[in-house]
Amino acid sequence: TGEARTRYVDVTGTDKGYMADLRTRLWLSGQVSDDWRYVAMLENLQSFNTNKEESETKFRRAYVTGNAGDIKVTGGRYNYTVGQGNVFDDGIDGVQIDFGKVLKASMAYGRPAGGNDFHSFQDAGGNTIYTKNNDAFITTLDYKTGNFTFNAAFYDFLDYVGNADNKIWTVGGSIDIGDTVKLHGEYLKSNFAANTDGEDEGIVFGLNYKGAEPEKKGSYGIWAKYYNQDRSTYVSHTTDAVHDSLWGFDGYGVGFDYTITKNITALVEYFDFNGKNSEGKDKTWWSDVTFTF
């Protein structure tokens, strides 16, 4: 299986710029035994920002997953979206266990593939060099009853600032209203403040209506979300908004996706973010079309 996504992003404000690229992904999987399987994903990213049309191809996923009794085990390089993605949504080289039926829990230990911006610099070739360990321990709890889902998580990013860990606690939930509407929110708390104003908290809440389904022509979805997060409350945020220079952000995002025809889906998003501890401001227009096969 696979997908091809063509994307254009335009940013005005502090991080002014644009991105235009084509991302192609191919998924490979095989059964190792009755209980275990291997999964890999090969990704090619071709940038159209310059006349060079630069391209790179890498294995972005390579992991094994299976069951050991009542415990699900995953190990290798895989994508880990924790909770609502407001703290971490990125690739990780690690090991994860999931268990529980009514009250579900998970524990993971590994090294985020995206590194640690607090301990990084660009070398002469433009490569990101990380100067310290960026291992992390992440544990989660999820509980669903009726239309309500509760989730909580604890993150410990080691040696995140100097020799100190960044420890983040989150608690959140969602409510399904019928089959089409979902309200969701999350509170976040860190053990240190990244900005001089002393803030170390965050809150995110939003609404989703329906959602585009690639196999269902004419299906669509609408979402809106409000964000207010200190820089210490996220490591690799799930948002598509550009906010690199804001060092924490306060603002909103809205989006609309639509299935044009079977396996062809379009997405348009808009974000308006203010910097938490600066006069910086970013407005992001994101648009893409994804072909699945």
Model-derived regions, located:
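Outer membrane beta-barrel
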Residues: 3, 18-121, 133-151, 174, ...
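Short, solvent-exposed loop/turn segments at conserved positions within beta-propeller repeat blades
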Residues: 130-134, 164
